[in-house]
């Protein structure tokens, strides 16, 4: 057997071996600048950096850039890897440039949180809804420019049915953080929030009937 034929046979054997080892699936190699997001990307919200009434993080370590954008008085584009959360169960993550221009490269997440960590319930771009049935992308579109889709007072976004007392209570009771840090009024705020969620579920149920 000549050398070239031997090399071809060895290469074929190696290829078959890789196919068996990977279940026949091609090995996905991430892009060099890709922002990898999985359930471990999300942590106790109070371990993130507070900015006014929300929290931010950066999966690529670029916190200076994220903070600069968050505090820019006239708005700015957030750097890739930025995580923005108002409540523990919802998040926005800035993906790599060009990943989804329609959403400004933001990916939206609905999370399930517990003492054991975070579980991604839903993720995507223009098709993710929050627990009130509101579409995340549609809510944030009015703040496209110059705020890079970040909703705050005066950014043009439609008002949400919860106030800062409710979001603060949720932040302080994030089960991923261990012992809650309740403040006066948190119990009432959480009760009102649960009532709003139940009302929303009832409305959806009635709509489903008719």
Q: What are these regions, as identified by a protein language model?
A:
Residues 1-2, 187:
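Helix-centric, low-specificity signal for extended rod-like, repetitive segments
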């Amino acid at each position: 057997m000549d050398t070239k034929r031997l090399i071809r046979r060895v290469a074929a054997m190696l290829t078959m071996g890789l196919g068996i080892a990977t279940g026949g699936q091609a090995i996905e190699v991430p892009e060099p600048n890709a922002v990898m997001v999985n359930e471990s990307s999300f942590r106790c919200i109070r371990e993130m950096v507070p900015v006014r009434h929300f929290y931010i993080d950066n999966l690529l370590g670029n916190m200076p850039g994220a903070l600069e954008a968050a505090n820019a008085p006239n708005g700015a584009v957030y750097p890739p890897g930025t995580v923005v959360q108002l409540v523990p169960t919802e998040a926005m993550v800035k993906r790599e440039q060009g990943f989804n221009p329609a959403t400004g490269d933001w990916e939206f997440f609905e999370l399930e949180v517990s003492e054991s960590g975070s579980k991604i319930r839903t993720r995507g771009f223009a098709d993710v809804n929050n627990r009130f049935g509101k579409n995340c992308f549609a809510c944030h579109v009015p703040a496209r420019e110059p705020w890079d889709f970040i909703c705050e007072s005066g950014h043009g976004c439609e008002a949400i049915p919860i106030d800062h007392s409710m979001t603060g209570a949720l932040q302080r009771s994030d089960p991923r953080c261990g012992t809650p840090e309740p403040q006066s009024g948190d119990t009432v705020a959480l009760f009102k929030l649960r009532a709003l969620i139940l009302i929303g579920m009832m409305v959806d149920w009635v709509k489903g009937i008719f």
